[in-house]
Each structure stands twice: as structure tokens, then as C-alpha cells.
Amino acid sequence: MTRTGLLGSPARASAVGIASGAALVAAVFLPWYQGNLGAPTVPGGRSGWESTTVAKGVFVLALVALVAALVIAADVADVVPLERRTAESLAWLLVASSIVAGILIGYRLARPPGPAEFLSRDIGLFLGVAAAVGGAVAGLAQLARRE
């Protein structure tokens, strides 16, 4: 008997995991910071990839989360049947990579690169935090399904 977890059905939890991983990858390339001085003085927003090396770490973690979510989804759809321990390990990998990515993004949200007094936060940071939370919740939902 399949239990419904945090996100309802296992397929829904898998879809949230995949969407969160993809959004986390995309967030790295969206603007993270915008200059406060105006367009004539400062060019448009800077993506996380351009702004900080932390974003490159987030990118790697996002790829790990996305691959884990895709393999879990293949297991849920019975395309690639996994052993219970393997599926649980992948779910924990999704949770851990999402949490660490969220912490890294949160750090850059709280402490932008210098000179920070001329920067405002942009959409990429906020999308990244939301995607990291979504990935962690999706991983936890997969773990709850397996109990």
C-alpha cells in the first residue's frame, strides 16, 4: 500500500523535485543583484554565475538535486526500479543538496558581494531559495513514502 506523504502522491512529489531542481539550475543564471545607482551608471542586473563563486557551487548542487529527482521519478514510474536503500539514499541526497544550496544562497542573500551598499537583491536569489525549499520538501516526501 502506497502512503501519501507531504505532497500527496509519489508522482507529485517527484514532479516537485524535478521542477525544484530545474528552477535551482535556472536561478543561478538569473539576475541576483541589481545596481541601485540607475541605468546610466551601472549596467543591468548581474546573474549569480557572474557575481559570485558561491553560485557555481549552487549550480553543482542543483545538478545533483536534479539528477537525484529524475532517478527517483523514474523509480516512481517503474521505469528504473531501485532497491529501497538506493531510493532512500537518493531522496536524502536530494534533501541534503537542496538544503546546502539554500544555505549558500541564503548567505549571499544576507551578505552580497562588495560594495554591497550599491546593490539590491534580484529575482534569482529569491527563486533559488524557493527552489531549494521545494527540493528539500520533495525529498522528505519521498522519504515519508518509503516508510
Task: Please provide the spans of the model-predicted regions.
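Compact integral membrane and secretory-pathway proteins
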Residues: M1-E147
